[in-house]
Amino acid sequence: MLQMLPVEPHLEVRKRLPQSASRRPPLLFVHGGYCDAWFWEPYFLPWFAARGYPAYALSLRGHGASGGSDTLFMAGLGDYEADVERIAATIDSPPVLIGHSMGAAIVERIMAKRPVRGAALLAPIPPAGLLPIASRLATSHPDYLMHMGGVDPSRMSANVLQALRPFYFGPHVAPKILAEAARHLNAESSRALFDLSLRLHWALPQRNHSPLFVLGAEGDVICTPDDVRATAAHHKVKATILPGLAHMLMLEPDWAHAAKALEGFLATLE
């Protein structure tokens, strides 16, 4: 018998709130594939909260401390989209949606269906989907896909971690951050990855002209600067590409460069 996904699994939410009342918009951060809400915790959540932005990050179903790990393989982008919408509805006022990589694709799907207060796509999956990325990496770095296909947090070896590091981080990432990131790696839904391969995040272009910011990293070998520019062109905006950062730009030593660029966009919404 086909097992249906639970309608509302428990979802982990991490938050940092300003110390005093603020009129600045709340922010809802959406993590990328294989990750969870922790990836925003070391730097972005406290940094934005200190500047008056109520900052929230959720773990999608089957990730982090959220429920649904037993049915993760059945979860598609539509299920992740529902998770984001459910948490957004619990926040006092409409949040700005900020997605990283796969999380950016989820934000794009939401933008295609309704106006949002504002949105930021960080290192987004390009309009062409995952297949060109996978093809490029299979040619240039064939070991990458082998390692990613077998990501199992319970059996994450030092060798696998070392093999994946150059794809996600720059050479100077703090060892403590790298070790903690490895602890928060999750298995990813094969259905969600299939959805990204079919470009299901792209099928409905934005029609409501919500304020949008697209940010990429010069050192990103997963979602390259050209990939990021393709996403920006699709939405008829200009991409911002920052030097000195890699794919996990929110955890890099120079993470503040990305945070300040994002803050500049947020200032236009006030």
Q: Where does each model-flagged region fall?
A:
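Active-site loop/oxyanion-hole signature of alpha/beta-hydrolase fold enzymes
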Residues: A65-P95
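The serine-hydrolase catalytic nucleophile loop
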Residues: G33-L45
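Active-site glycine-rich loops that stabilize anionic/oxyanionic intermediates
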Residues: H31-D36, S101, E218
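Conserved alpha/beta-hydrolase "acid-adjacent" motif
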Residues: V221-A230
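Conserved alpha/beta-hydrolase
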Residues: W47-S69
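Short beta-strand/loop motif that positions the catalytic acidic residue
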Residues: N208, V214-G216
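Catalytic active-site module of serine/aspartate enzymes centered on a nucleophile-bearing elbow/loop
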Residues: K238-E270
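Flexible "cap/lid" loop of the alpha/beta hydrolase fold
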Residues: P115-G150, A192-L196
